Design a protein with these regions (language model features):
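N-terminal catalytic or cofactor-binding beta/alpha core of small enzyme domains
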Residues: 1-157, 161, 174-175, 181-185, ...
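Short glycine/threonine-rich loop-to-helix capping motif typified by GTGT followed
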Residues: 215-224
Length: 277
C-alpha cells in the first residue's frame, strides 16, 4: 500500500474519474479537508495541473449558471483556483544512491537550468508554515520509524509555474521503504495532522542559503526553533544566486520573508559574494 491508497482508505474518500484532458487518465478522490489527484506521468512536469483544474471549474460553473449541462462558459477559472486551492502537495518516492531510509520534504524550483521539469531559473511558490507543521508532526512520530532520517531537502526540480505553493513529501530511498507500512502510516498521519490542525508560523519566515542538499542545520532550525523556511539553496547552487534570484526566493513565499539565513560554514567559495548581495 502506498501513500495515496493509505489516505484513500483512512479518509473514506469519494472517487471521480476523468479521461478528457490531453489523453490523460485522472482520478480524483475527495474528502472535507483535501482532494487527492492520481495522475499519469511525471510529477516533476505537472505544470498542466492549473490548466486542468481551471477548465474543470469553468465547466462546472458554466453548468450551474446556464443549467444546460454543456459547460458553455469561457475562459480560465483562475478565480476558482485562487478561492478553492491553498497548496499543491505531491506524494512522491524519494530516490538516492545511498538507498538510506529517509522521510523528507522540500519546495520546488530551478536556480539554473531545468533538467528535471519546470522552467529555468524559476522557483515555485512556497508555504513555509505548512512545511514546518509537517516536519514537526513527522519528528514527533520519529519513534515509530527509528531507522529513518527525517530531513528537509534543498529546493530542486519542477514543477515551478503553478499558481499555488508546491510541497513535495517523500519516502525513500528504495523500493523497500516505499512499501514500508510504518513509513507510509507515519507520513500520512503527519500530513493529515498538518492539514486538519494547521498552525501558522508566519512571524518568522526565512530563505536559506548554503549547506548540503540534505541541510541538517536547516532541518534542526525548522524543528527546534519558531522559524519557518521558504526556498532553500544548497551550496551547489550558490553560484546561481544573484540579486534577482534572491528577490525571487523572497517573493515566491506566500508568507512574508523577514530573514535571510546563512549556513556560514556551508557557503564555500561563494561566501564573500553572497554576503555582499
Amino acid at each position: 500500500m502506498n501513500m495515496a491508497s493509505y489516505l484513500i482508505a483512512q479518509c473514506g474518500m469519494k472517487e471521480e474519474v476523468y479521461a478528457d484532458y490531453a489523453e490523460r487518465n485522472i482520478t480524483i478522490y475527495s474528502c472535507p479537508y483535501f482532494a487527492l489527484m492520481l495522475i499519469d506521468g511525471s510529477a516533476l512536469e505537472a505544470e498542466w495541473i492549473d490548466e486542468w483544474l481551471s477548465e474543470r471549474m469553468r465547466k462546472r460553473r458554466g453548468n450551474e449558471v446556464n443549467g444546460t449541462g454543456d459547460g458553455s462558459s469561457s475562459g480560465r477559472d483562475d478565480d476558482g483556483i485562487s478561492r478553492y486551492i491553498n497548496c499543491y502537495i505531491f506524494l512522491s518516492r524519494h530516490r538516492s544512491e545511498s538507498n538510506k531510509p529517509t522521510l523528507t520534504s522540500h519546495s520546488t524550483g530551478n536556480f539554473s537550468h531545468a533538467s528535471m521539469g519546470g522552467n529555468a531559473r524559476e522557483l515555485a511558490y512556497t508555504y513555509p508554515s505548512l512545511q514546518k507543521c509537517y516536519m514537526l508532526n513527522l519528528y514527533s512520530n520519529r519513534g515509530k520509524v527509528p531507522n529513518y532520517d527525517i530531513v528537509i531537502e534543498a529546493t530542486h526540480h519542477g514543477p515551478t509555474s503553478l499558481a499555488k505553493p508546491v510541497l513535495f513529501i517523500e519516502i525513500g530511498s528504495s523500493e523497500r521503504e516505499w512499501s514500508d507500512m510504518d513509513a507510509v502510516s507515519v507520513t500520512c498521519h503527519s500530513l493529515l495532522a498538518s492539514i486538519v490542525n494547521f498552525k501558522e508560523y508566519s512571524k518568522k519566515v526565512g530563505v536559506a542559503l548554503g549547506g548540503t542538499h540534505y541541510p541538517e542545520k536547516f532541518t534542526n532550525l525548522l524543528i527546534d526553533s519558531d522559524i519557518a523556511l521558504a526556498s532553500v539553496a544548497s551550496k551547489h547552487n550558490l553560484k546561481h544566486i544573484d540579486e534577482s534570484m534572491l528577490r525571487q526566493m523572497i517573493a515566491k513565499s506566500i508568507e512574508p520573508v523577514r530573514y535571510i539565513i546563512l549556513d556560514w560554514k556551508g557557503l564555500g567559495g561563494e561566501k564573500d559574494r553572497i554576503v555582499n548581495l
